[in-house]
Amino acid sequence: MMFAYIVAVVSALALTSAYPTGAPSSTCVSMRPGHLADPQPLPAPYTISTPVNTMKAGDSIEVTISGNTPDDFFRGILLQARQGDNIVGKWTVKDDFSKLLDCGEPDNAVTHANSVDKTTVSYIWTAPEDFVGDVVFLVTIVKVYETFWVAIPSAPVTVLSHK
C-alpha cells in the first residue's frame, strides 16, 4: 500500500514538472527540459532545414523542423540560433503551436505554446544587422515526457556582411 502511494506521488511530481505551455527561460543555457529522464542519443529522428546555407546580416530565413517519418511527432520544442555558446538573432512564429521566449534578449528563442502533436513546424529567423559568421540552429525536441533529444544541431548557415 505504501509503495503504491509513493509511486502515485512520484508520478504526480513528474507530470507537474513538465512544461505543456512552453519551456521556461531557466532552460535557455542547457536546453534540457528538466524531465526526470535521460535524453535520447543523437542522431534524432528529426531534421532542421533551411532553404539556403548562406545569407546576409539583417536578412531573414525560414527554419523548418520536421520528423523523418509520420510517426516522428513531437509535443515540445526549444529552438535557438547560436554562434558558439551565444544565442543570436530574433525569431518570428507563424502558428498557434509556438511562442517566443526571452533567453537573455527578447524573441531570441522559440518554444511550444501547447502540447499538441506536430510533425512539422517552421519559423522565421532574422540575423542581427551587425552579425557576420556561422550560426547553427539548435533544437531540443520532446516527443513525450520521457522521450526527448537535447540540442539537435542543424548544418551551419553562414551570415555575410550586408554591405
UniProtKB/Swiss-Prot annotation:
Compartment(s) where it occurs, according to its Swiss-Prot or TrEMBL record: Secreted
Single Gene Ontology BP annotation: innate immune response
Any single GO CC term annotated in Swiss-Prot or TrEMBL for this entry: membrane
Coiled coil: none
Disulphide-bridged cysteine pairs: 28-103
InterPro entries given in the database record: Ferric-chelate_Red/DefProt (IPR051237), Reeler_dom (IPR002861), Reeler_sf (IPR042307)
Signal keyword on record: yes
Family: Belongs to the insect defense protein family.
Function text: May have antimicrobial activity.
Protein name according to UniProt: Putative defense protein 3
Source organism (scientific name): Antheraea mylitta
